[in-house]
């Protein structure tokens, strides 16, 4: 391990704490929005300190300008336009744009994978079936 590099176990703990803080922010938002904003800020600080990426599912849940936790319909507006998902923060008015292409590709890939696995199981069933004489292939 070179000098200044953190051990893997430390990075794993940081990732777990980030996830816990975002889940707590999500739970706490309806009762106490300021506390959820603080949880988001703490999670972001941990990510910066340990140089760990915030998971994609949570990256879109806080404002990049004011760092407040975003709850669609409560303090942010979500719109889809021109192949992008637009999040508008009601706290500061900042608009974040994320490309919609990745979601489309993931959905298309999952559809193709589920279709090929269904066909693959059908082929396996027909291959192991009995032949015309009523004997299985192992009886020959």
Curated annotation (Swiss-Prot):
Regions of compositional bias (Basic and acidic residues) in chain numbering: 111-121
Reaction catalysis annotation: Endonucleolytic cleavage of RNA, removing 5'-extranucleotides from tRNA precursor
Coiled-coil boundaries: none
Entry note: cofactor: Binds 1 zinc ion per subunit.
Residues that coordinate or bind Zn(2+): 63, 66, 89, 92
Keyword Lipid biosynthesis listed: no
Alphabetical keyword list: Cytoplasm, Endonuclease, Hydrolase, Metal-binding, Nuclease, tRNA processing, Zinc
Function noted in UniProt: Part of ribonuclease P, a protein complex that generates mature tRNA molecules by cleaving their 5'-ends.
Protein name listed in UniProt: Ribonuclease P protein component 4
């Amino acid at each position: 391990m070179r000098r200044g590099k953190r051990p893997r176990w430390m990075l794993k703990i940081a990732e777990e704490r980030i996830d816990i803080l975002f889940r707590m922010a999500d739970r706490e938002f309806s009762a106490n929005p300021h506390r959820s904003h603080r949880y988001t800020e703490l999670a972001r600080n941990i990510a910066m300190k340990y140089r760990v990426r915030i998971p994609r599912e949570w990256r879109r849940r806080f404002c990049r300008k004011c760092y407040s936790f975003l709850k669609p319909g409560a303090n942010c507006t979500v719109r889809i336009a021109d192949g992008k998902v637009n999040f508008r923060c009601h706290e500061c008015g900042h608009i974040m744009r994320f490309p919609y292409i990745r979601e489309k590709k993931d959905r298309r890939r999952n559809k193709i994978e589920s279709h090929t696995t269904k066909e693959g199981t059908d082929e396996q069933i027909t291959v192991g079936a009995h032949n015309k004489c009523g004997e299985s292939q192992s009886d020959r």
